[in-house]
């Protein structure tokens, strides 16, 4: 049994999953994916530090929407309100785009009486504006390849592709 566990959860499992992934004919065309990074270069170009005002995210959604993307995905958890004008601007952009997906996150919280996994979701205003929500956090294997996704929550990639989402 120990040998079986090693085979199913070790290097052979990774090789097996990699081979199946390689042979899968329904892979997405990476030429169809555009990533707009929010990084140090972006901060310098915008002459702003993080967090950016929500108007910036709203304008980003408005500009990207002009190219009619299948979806616009933010790997950012907008869990706290900003100022009302800024949040409303972003919510309006989300509503107009009709294809925005925002991140949620899971974390373990330990309390005095109860401990458990808690989901952190975007503020209600953005979901009411039509944003879909997907789980952002995934864990890579020891070789830094992501092969497993949580099965109890819709990941950002599943929501973007329309898989497993109501």
Question: Language-model features: where?
Answer:
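Non-transmembrane functional regions of envelope-associated proteins
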Residues: 1-166
